C-alpha cells in the first residue's frame, strides 16, 4: 500500500525549498534581487502582507496607474500559507460571480510569464470532478445550467471519456464527470515572484522584512503605518496578512473572524505507470472520497479534506496569537487523520498502492466561517480594506487583485461579490461561532451543494429574535446574518426533517398552505432580521437626497428607494420612512445590513453632512401581518383608525397595539394588505401572542420566507441580490417607477443613468412561466433560444395560483416581448417558458384603487 519512503518529514522547520512539491524546489520563478533600501514616507496605498494575494493587488494597482504603492511584508515574500500551497487552479466555482474571479486569475497566469520574463510553472492539463452517486450527477447538472451563461468552458462527460483522460482510474463506481479543460496547477512561489517582478516594474515598493508594529488612524482618514524601518502615511491600508490578519486587525480594535486550519497533502515518488504516460494527467477531485489528486512530476500529489470530527484547527493561535517567528514552518504531519481518504484514493487510483511517500506537507491555511474570503472596505473604519481569509488563495489571488484594484481606483466594485463582503460578519460572530463554522466548512468541503442549503454548526448565535423560543419547534429555521428566521412551518404529522434536494421536497406542500393562508385569510411573519438604521440631523434630508434615486417621502410616509453607484448600478434597495421632520428609519435586507451602512456612512463623511447615523438593527423586532383580514385583526388591538382612507398605503404612524408601542408602516412584501410593525425587541413575544390571540376568529397562522418569496414573485416584486445588484442598472431591472431622473438633487449615479437611458438598453428583466415536472427555478439558470444561451434567470419559485413555475430572467431587449417563447435549463433539461405580462397577480393596493375607480365611473 501507499507507504512512507526514505524521506519522512515529521514537523520539521522547513525552508521554502523543502516540504513542497518538487516544482517549487526548482525555483522556476527565482526571485529578482531585493529592492534597494529605499523608503517612502507617503503612499497612496499600503498593503500589509507579501503573500500571493497582497502581491497581486500591488501588481494590479500599479499596472492600472496608481503611484506610491507600498507593500510591507514581515519576513519574506510567500511566507505564511502561499509557499506550501498545492497550487490548484480551476475555472469551477459554485458561486456565480466567483467564477469571474477564477477566470481572471487563470487568464492572468497564462500571460504572466511573457509579461514579466519569470517562469511561473503553470500546468493546464484540465480537471475532472467525479460523480459516483445519482445525487452528485444532479449536482453537476445543476452547476452546468449555472455555468452555461458564463465564459467558463465546462462539460459533463461520460465514463468512457473520463477513462480516456485518466487511464489509471478504477471505473467501477464512476457515473459521470464534470470536466474543465483549462484547469490545472501552478507553482505558488514562482507565481508570487512573477507578480512581484511585475509590481516592481510598475513602480511598487516591496519592503521586507518590514513588520507592521502599529496602525494609527488620523482625523483626515489617512493612516500612519509604523514599522522598525520607519513610518509611512497612507491614504488607505489593505490588510492582506494571511494568518496574521487577526493580529493586524487587533491593532485597530477589530477581531476578524478567521482561524488557521491544518491542511495536509502527500507527495509520492515516481510511479512507473505515471511516468509511462505521454501527457500530464488531469487534476482529479473525488468528491465522495473528499480529496484532490494531481500529477507531480512522475508521481502524484494527494490532498484530503478530513471530516469535521477529525480535522484540526489551530485554535491556540486564536487564543494566544500566531507564534512570532512562524513564517515558513510546517506542523507535524498526521497520517492517521487521513487514513480513510488514503484508502479511498488507493481504491480509485490503484497505482497508489505501490507508491512511496517522499513528502508530507501539513501547513496552515486561513478559514473564515463560511470558507469564503473577506474582500473590500470594512465598515466602521475609514480607508481600511481587507483581502483575507483565503482558503483557496492561489486561484483567488489574481482575480481578487484585479477586482480590489478596480474597486479602489473607481470607487465601486466592478461586479457584485457581496458573498465576499467583510461586512457580512458582525459583533455576533464570536470566536466560538468562527471555530464551529470553520470546522464545519472544512469538513463539508466536498459535500453535495444543494439549493436552499442550510448548515447548522454554531447556531443559534446571540442574535435571535424575541420569537425564537416560541417558533423553533414549529418551523424550519434559516440563517440570515446571524439571525434565525422561519423558512417554513410544519403541522403535527408532517415531515419536519431538513431534506435538501434539487427537486421539490418536504417543504413544498406546507409552503403552499402558507401561501393560501396569506392570500385568503391572514398570516404573521417574523421580519426581525431586517437591517434598521436611524438617521437624523440638520443635513439628514440632503444626505438621503444625495444617496437615493427616488424623492424623499413626506413626513409620515414611506417609499422604496435605491442607492446607485457612480456607474448607475444598484448598490442597495431601501425602505425609507420619514418618521418626523429630519428623522428617518431606513430598512434593508438582513444580508445587506453593514454593506449598506458602510456606504451611507462613507457618503456622510465624504460630503461633510451634519447627521447622526445609528444602527438599531438589534434594538428592534419586526412583525409582518398580511392578508385580507390583516386590518380586521389589528383593529381589534388598537384605537388608531386603520381604514384605507385614514391609514393609507405607504403611510407610517406611531401607535400602540394592545398597549405595546410600535411604528406601523402600511407595506408588505407579500403584495397583500399588510403592515410591518417595528417594536422593541423585548416586546416581540408579547406582541406576537396578542396578535395571534386576536386573530383566532379570522384563522390567523404563521408563514415563512419561502411563501413570502412565492408571493412577491407573483406580484413581480424585485429582490436586491437577485434581480438587482452591482451588476445591474435600475432601468433594465424594471425599476423606472422608483428612479426620479428629474428630481433636483444630483444623486449618485444620476448622470451615468442618463447616459444609459440615452444609449438604450441591451437587456431587460422579464417574468416567465414554465411548465416543469418536479423541479423549479432557483435563479442563475441558463435561458436558451434557438439552441443558444441568451440570458439567465435571477430567482424563481412555484406559483401556487397557476400551478406552474415562475421566474424572473434577463434576456436581450429584442426577445423581451410578452408572449415570447424561450427555454430554461433545469437539471440538464430545457423546459419551454413564456414571457408574461407582469405582475401575474395584482397587488392589493392596485386592486383597491381599481375598485374605487370602477365605483367612480
Swiss-Prot record:
Subcellular location(s) per record: Mitochondrion
This protein's UniProt keywords: Acetylation, FAD, Flavoprotein, Mitochondrion, Oxidoreductase, Transit peptide
EC number, UniProt record: 1.5.8.4
Residues with PTM Tele-8alpha-FAD histidine: 84
A single Gene Ontology CC term: mitochondrion
Modified sites of kind N6-succinyllysine: 141, 310, 312, 427, 469, 516, 648, 786, 788
Free-text cofactor note: Binds 1 FAD covalently per monomer.
Record-linked InterPro entries: FAD-dep_OxRdtase (IPR006076), FAD/NAD-bd_sf (IPR036188), FAO_M (IPR032503), GCST_C (IPR013977), GCV_T_N (IPR006222), GcvT/YgfZ/DmdA (IPR028896), GcvT/YgfZ_C (IPR029043), TrmE/GcvT_dom1 (IPR027266)
Positions with a binding annotation for (6S)-5,6,7,8-tetrahydrofolate: 573-575, 669, 676-678, 737
Chief location of this protein within or outside the cell: mitochondrion
Protein name: Dimethylglycine dehydrogenase, mitochondrial
Protein encoded by which gene: Dmgdh
Amino acid at each position: 500500500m501507499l507507504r512512507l519512503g526514505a524521506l519522512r518529514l515529521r514537523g520539521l522547520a522547513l525552508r521554502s525549498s523543502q516540504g513542497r512539491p518538487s516544482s517549487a524546489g526548482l525555483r522556476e520563478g527565482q526571485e529578482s534581487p531585493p529592492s534597494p533600501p529605499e523608503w517612502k514616507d507617503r503612499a497612496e496605498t499600503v498593503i500589509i502582507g507579501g503573500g500571493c494575494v497582497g502581491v497581486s493587488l500591488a501588481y494590479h494597482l500599479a499596472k492600472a496607474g496608481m503611484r506610491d504603492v507600498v507593500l510591507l511584508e514581515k519576513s519574506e515574500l510567500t511566507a505564511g500559507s502561499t509557499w506550501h500551497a498545492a497550487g490548484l487552479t480551476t475555472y469551477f466555482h459554485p458561486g456565480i460571480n466567483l467564477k469571474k474571479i477564477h477566470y481572471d486569475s487563470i487568464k492572468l497566469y497564462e500571460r504572466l510569464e511573457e509579461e514579466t520574463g519569470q517562469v511561473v510553472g503553470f500546468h493546464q492539463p484540465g480537471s475532472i470532478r467525479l460523480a459516483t452517486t445519482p445525487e452528485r450527477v444532479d449536482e453537476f447538472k445543476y452547476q452546468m445550467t449555472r455555468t452555461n451563461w458564463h465564459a467558463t468552458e465546462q462539460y459533463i462527460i461520460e465514463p468512457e471519456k473520463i477513462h480516456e483522460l485518466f487511464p489509471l482510474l478504477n471505473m467501477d463506481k464512476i457515473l459521470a464527470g464534470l470536466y474543465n479543460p483549462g484547469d490545472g496547477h501552478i507553482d505558488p512561489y514562482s507565481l508570487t515572484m512573477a507578480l512581484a517582478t511585475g509590481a516592481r516594474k510598475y513602480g511598487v515598493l516591496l519592503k521586507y522584512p518590514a513588520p507592521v508594529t502599529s496602525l494609527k488612524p488620523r482625523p483626515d482618514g489617512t493612516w500612519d503605518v509604523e514599522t522598525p524601518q520607519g513610518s509611512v502615511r497612507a491614504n488607505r491600508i489593505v490588510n492582506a496578512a494571511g494568518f496574521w490578519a487577526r493580529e493586524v486587525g487587533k491593532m485597530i480594535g477589530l477581531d476578524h473572524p478567521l482561524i488557521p486550519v491544518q491542511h495536509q497533502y502527500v507527495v509520492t515518488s515516481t510511479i512507473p505507470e505515471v511516468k509511462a504516460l505521454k501527457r500530464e494527467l488531469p487534476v482529479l477531485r473525488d468528491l465522495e472520497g473528499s480529496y484532490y489528486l494531481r500529477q507531480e512530476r512522475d508521481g502524484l500529489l494527494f490532498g484530503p479534506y478530513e471530516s469535521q470530527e477529525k480535522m484540526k484547527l489551530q485554535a491556540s493561535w486564536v487564543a494566544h496569537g500566531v507564534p512570532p517567528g512562524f513564517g515558513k514552518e510546517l506542523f507535524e504531519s498526521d497520517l492517521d487523520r487521513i487514513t480513510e481518504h488514503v484508502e479511498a484514493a488507493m481504491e480509485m487510483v490503484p497505482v497508489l498502492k505501490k507508491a512511496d511517500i517522499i513528502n508530507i506537507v501539513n501547513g496552515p491555511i486561513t478559514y473564515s466561517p463560511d470558507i469564503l474570503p473577506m474582500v473590500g472596505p470594512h465598515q466602521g473604519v475609514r480607508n481600511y480594506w481587507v483581502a483575507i481569509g483565503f482558503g483557496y488563495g492561489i486561484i483567488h489571488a489574481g482575480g481578487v487583485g484585479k477586482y480590489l484594484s478596480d474597486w479602489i481606483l473607481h470607487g465601486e466594485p466592478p461586479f457584485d461579490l457581496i458573498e465576499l463582503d467583510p461586512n457580512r460578519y458582525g459583533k455576533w460572530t464570536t470566536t466560538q461561532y468562527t471555530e464551529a463554522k470553520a470546522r464545519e466548512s472544512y469538513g463539508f468541503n466536498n459535500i453535495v451543494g444543494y439549493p436552499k442549503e442550510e448548515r447548522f454548526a454554531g447556531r443559534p448565535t446571540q442574535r435571535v429574535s424575541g420569537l425564537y423560543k416560541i417558533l423553533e419547534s414549529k418551523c424550519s429555521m434559516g440563517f440570515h446574518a446571524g439571525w434565525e428566521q422561519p423558512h417554513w412551518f410544519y403541522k403535527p404529522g408532517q415531515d419536519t426533517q431538513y431534506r435538501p434536494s434539487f427537486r421539490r421536497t418536504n417543504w413544498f406542500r406546507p409552503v403552499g398552505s402558507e401561501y393560501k393562508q396569506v392570500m385568503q385569510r391572514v398570516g404573521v411573519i417574523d421580519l426581525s432580521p431586517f437591517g434598521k438604521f436611524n438617521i437624523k440631523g440638520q443635513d439628514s434630508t440632503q444626505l438621503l437626497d444625495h444617496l437615493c434615486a427616488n424623492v424623499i417621502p413626506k413626513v409620515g410616509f414611506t417609499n422604496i428607494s435605491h442607492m446607485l453607484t457612480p456607474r448607475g448600478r444598484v448598490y442597495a434597495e431601501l425602505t425609507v420612512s420619514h418618521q418626523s421632520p429630519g428623522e428617518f428609519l431606513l430598512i434593508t435586507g438582513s444580508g445587506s445590513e453593514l454593506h449598506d451602512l458602510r456606504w451611507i456612512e462613507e457618503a456622510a463623511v465624504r460630503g461633510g453632512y451634519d447627521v447622526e447615523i445609528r444602527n438599531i438593527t438589534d434594538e428592534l423586532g419586526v412583525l409582518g401581518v398580511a392578508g385580507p383580514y390583516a386590518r380586521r385583526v389589528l383593529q381589534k388591538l388598537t384605537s388608531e383608525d386603520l381604514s384605507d382612507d385614514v391609514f393609507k398605503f405607504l403611510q407610517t404612524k406611531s401607535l400602540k397595539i394592545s398597549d405595546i408601542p410600535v411604528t406601523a408602516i402600511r407595506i408588505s412584501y407579500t403584495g397583500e394588505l399588510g403592515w410591518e410593525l417595528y417594536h422593541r425587541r423585548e416586546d416581540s413575544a408579547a406582541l406576537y401572542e396578542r396578535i395571534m390571540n386576536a386573530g383566532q376568529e379570522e384563522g390567523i397562522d404563521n408563514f415563512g420566507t419561502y411563501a413570502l418569496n412565492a408571493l412577491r414573485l407573483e406580484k413581480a416584486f424585485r429582490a436586491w441580490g437577485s434581480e438587482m445588484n452591482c451588476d445591474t442598472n435600475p432601468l433594465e431591472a424594471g425599476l423606472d417607477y422608483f428612479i426620479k431622473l428629474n428630481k433636483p438633487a444630483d444623486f449618485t449615479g444620476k448622470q451615468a443613468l442618463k447616459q444609459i437611458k440615452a444609449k438604450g438598453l441591451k437587456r431587460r428583466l422579464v417574468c416567465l412561466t414554465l411548465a416543469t415536472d418536479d423541479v423549479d427555478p432557483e435563479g442563475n439558470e441558463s435561458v436558451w433560444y434557438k439552441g443558444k444561451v441568451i440570458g439567465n434567470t435571477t430567482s424563481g419559485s412555484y406559483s401556487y395560483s397557476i400551478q406552474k413555475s415562475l421566474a424572473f430572467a434577463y434576456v436581450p431587449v429584442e426577445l423581451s416581448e410578452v408572449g415570447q417563447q424561450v427555454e430554461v435549463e433545469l437539471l440538464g433539461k430545457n423546459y419551454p417558458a413564456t414571457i408574461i405580462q407582469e405582475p401575474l397577480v395584482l397587488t392589493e393596493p392596485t386592486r383597491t384603487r381599481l375598485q374605487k375607480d370602477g365605483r367612480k365611473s
